[in-house]
Amino acid sequence: MIIHPNFDPVAIHLGPLAVRWYGLMYLVGFILAIVVGRLRLKLPHVAAQGWSAKDIDDMMFYGVLGVVLGGRLGYVLFYKADYYFSHPLDIFRVWEGGMSFHGGFLGVTLAMALFAWQRKRHWLEVTDFVAPMVPTGLAAGRLGNFINGELWGRVTSPDAPWAMLFPGASRDDAAWLAAHQDIAAKWNLNEVFLAHQMLPRHPSQLYEIALEGIALFFVLWFFSRKPRPMGAISALFLIGYGAARFTVEFAREPDDFLGLLTFGLSMGQWLSLPMIVAGVLMMIWAYRRGGAAKAA
């Protein structure tokens, strides 16, 4: 078993200002997105559409607003609506954590629609350009989760070579052990807990980096290197992210205030299913519509 290093969540102290790893990873994610965007400008079919470095900078401004506002509101509405409706001022306490990818996705989608309207471009032309820039940011965000030792995975066998002990999960581990003595006996987890006061879990943040970040980036990057029908790249992002997130959720610990929902699926899985369906329908529409004149 591997013990999580239990990093200090603060990366740098600048006088009274504490720069946290999670915020730093957001910055890294946006920088990586800009780098990928500028690499895309070198592709002939992308350059032919008249995209510029200034367009990327402006997109990122809109994107930052969409991620922060959408991510926070998505967490409030999708995950803890009852709490925040009772404590509305706590919605603004973003430094305490609480962001939702699906909310951020909706926020960015609306932000890109506004950008497209202002630039008099088709909305899907913009999202096709942006889609390959997103996975590197997702990977950076999940790395921030891992450094913080949060959003850990479900309990697994201590014999699994990837099993990891998360110090931050010790209280949850004790509750899990009391409720699952049948599995604990099968995997000898009582002995593990006595020795470490923790249980082995999937490092699901690393799975998400691998699937939602690295794998999805390469799929989108190579797919977008050739002209595609308008909407096809956006559709592939929806399918790829939705499928990756749906899969990883089987190894990720559900939110304790929600647990598993209908059919034993998590909230993340239920929010990912519409993405997959929408992506498939959009891909069919894009190729039936035909033509790559407006491809990104």
UniProtKB/Swiss-Prot annotation:
Keyword rRNA processing part of the UniProt annotation: no
Keywords from the named record: Cell inner membrane, Cell membrane, Membrane, Transferase, Transmembrane, Transmembrane helix
A single MF term (Gene Ontology): phosphatidylglycerol-prolipoprotein diacylglyceryl transferase activity
Pathway this chain belongs to: Protein modification; lipoprotein biosynthesis (diacylglyceryl transfer)
Transmembrane segments: 17-37, 59-79, 97-117, 230-250, 265-285
Disulfide pattern: none
Domain of life according to the entry: Bacteria
Enzyme Commission number: 2.5.1.145
One GO term describing the cellular component: plasma membrane
Function: Catalyzes the transfer of the diacylglyceryl group from phosphatidylglycerol to the sulfhydryl group of the N-terminal cysteine of a prolipoprotein, the first step in the formation of mature lipoproteins.
Name the UniProt record assigns to this protein: Phosphatidylglycerol--prolipoprotein diacylglyceryl transferase
Organism: Burkholderia thailandensis (strain ATCC 700388 / DSM 13276 / CCUG 48851 / CIP 106301 / E264)
Lineage: Bacteria, Pseudomonadati, Pseudomonadota, Betaproteobacteria, Burkholderiales
Gene this protein is translated from: lgt
